Every structure is written in structure tokens, then in C-alpha cells.
Amino acid sequence: MLFVLSGCAGELSMLDPAGPAASSQYWVWWVLLGVSLVVAMVVFVLWFYTFWRKEVPQRTMQEERRIMLRWVLGGGVILPVVCIIGLLVFAAPTGRGMLPLPLAAGEPERIEVVGHQWWWEVRYPGEGEEPDVITANRLVMPAGEPVDFRIISADVIHAFWIPRLGGKRDMVPGRASTIRLEADEPGVFGAQCAEFCGAQHTHMLLQVEAVEREAYDAWLAERRAPPQLSPEHDQAQAAFGEHCAACHTVAGFPDTLINAAMDHAIEGPDLTDIGSRPNLGAGVLPMEEGAIAYWLQHHQTLKPGNRMPPHNHIDRETLEQIGAWLEALQP
């Protein structure tokens, strides 16, 4: 048993809870495992006893029927009903804890998460005249307080799951749902789409960072200030407007540089702060110098089937210039 459980460690393990919902699920898991083992042991003991007993007692037909009825009622009805009701009563508070119920004081932070094939869009709605903060494949949340995640899918069914904080919840196209999670303390947690959504399902990772409230507010304020476009990247910005701006957005990017002849359907990730993200392609490449240029040149090899078309018509030098500029987009 210990050998098997040793494979349950890691950042995607629910056996290392870091929040109230995950802690409740942790205990439900252990209780369910314990009850299952006890029932399995009883069944195996009775099964072995049936084969190993040396003498079979002689009974009348009526006695045999009474014994059979006891086993059917006891083992087939009473025991399952008692176990299931007990587990439901024990587990009910866990599900209730993840519902967006009114809090005793204040309002929870709200974050929107949209699942795409195969990446995550994360939105922080602004209040009043504040602009929304939009990022991708990285989720920053305040620690020590409940957060309501409004989740939806843009294409197929996905599932939002942060094992160490709780979950999971299906993301259904056209239907929004809400799940409430909380991180006990600051930390970095792994998240993964938990519903098969196509060829690159396994390459749909989300890095979750829980930070103190002050750091969270500062992070949002930095993202709401559009990045300053440096003159040293003029050629890269012109190339981005020509080839990339039909699908991707950078806050503050001048409309005059966007190729008006192209169909504009923003279907790719917002790239406003891409240089500060921990990885590319939802976990395919670590973010390091030259990584974006390499991704632009080889993305269909690194993540086959992703919706960004090949860039065979763009020379390598131009792709490297675009990559260098995008890496510089950091608050």
C-alpha cells in the first residue's frame, strides 16, 4: 500500500491539500479508501472460507432459504445502503464548501477562467472604468480568502481542476458555472484540464500562484497599466501587426500597425504580459531567452494540432525579432 501511495505525490496530488476544500476532499478520500478496504477484506475472507472449509453442514431447504435471504438482505441491501448513506453524510459538507454561497462578511474575489483547445484564458473583471486584466496559462489569486471562479468553455468540454486546492468542475460550452476555492497560504500550485478535450489534452497545464492580498492588488495594478512600446522594437511591432494581430492582442498596441486587410477574430491568447509567464504553450516550453522565437518556428512540432498556423512564409530573422519583443512585455 505504501509503495502504491508513493506514486501519489507531486504538484497535481490531492493528497497534499493546501486549502479548505482540498482538505475536506482529502479526508473523504481516506475514509472512502478505508471503508472500501474493510468491505473488500470481508468479501475476500468469506470467499476463501467458502472454498477452504472442509465440511459442508447439512441443512434443510427451508434453512438454506433463510440463510440465503439473510445474506441477500444483509450483504446486498443493508450494508450497501448504510455505507452509501454514511459516506454521503460525511462528504456533503465538502461539496457545500465549494458552492458560491453568501459569506458572513464581505464579497469573495471573482476570477473568470475560459477553457480553450488547448490553453487557459484568465480574466480579472475591472470595477467601474477599470479595464479587465487578461492573461493566459497563469492564474494569480489572493491567499487566505475565498475566491469564486466563474468557469466556461469556448469550444469543447474541459474540466477545471487544481488538485491541492479542490475541484474539479466541468467547463461546458454555453454554460457558466462557479466554484469557490481558497489557498491557506501563499504558494505555487499545478492545475490541469481533467476532461479529455483532444489530441493535446495533456499539454493543457495552468500554473496557479497564491500571493498575499497586497501583492495581488499590486499585481493587478501593474497589469492594468498598458506596457510601454519601446522604439527599439519598431520592426518587431510592425511585423506583429502584419502577421499576428489578427488573432492576438497586446494592450496599448497601436491600431495603425494592424493589417486591416486581414480577418480579425481574436482566438489566440492575450500576449500583453507574456514575458512574465512561467511557460509557453500551456506547459510545453519553459519561458527563457529565445523560447518565444523557438516556439514561433516549431510550435506545430512541439504541440501538433494547435490552432496557430505555421509561419513558413515569415523569415527566421523576423520571427526572432517578434520573439525578442514579446519576451520584453513584462510589467
Language-model segments: residues:
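Non-transmembrane, membrane-proximal soluble domains of secreted or membrane proteins
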Residues: 9-28, 51-266, 283-297, 302-304, ...
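Alpha-helical transmembrane segments
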Residues: 40-56
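Residues within alpha-helical transmembrane segments of multi-pass membrane proteins, especially transporters
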Residues: 38-45, 78, 82
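Short, solvent-exposed mixed-charge patches
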Residues: 8, 330-331
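N-terminal secretory/membrane targeting signals
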Residues: 1-10
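Aromatic- and Gly/Pro-enriched helix-to-coil junctions and flexible linker segments
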Residues: 324-329
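Membrane-entry segments of alpha-helical transmembrane domains in multi-pass membrane proteins
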Residues: 21-42
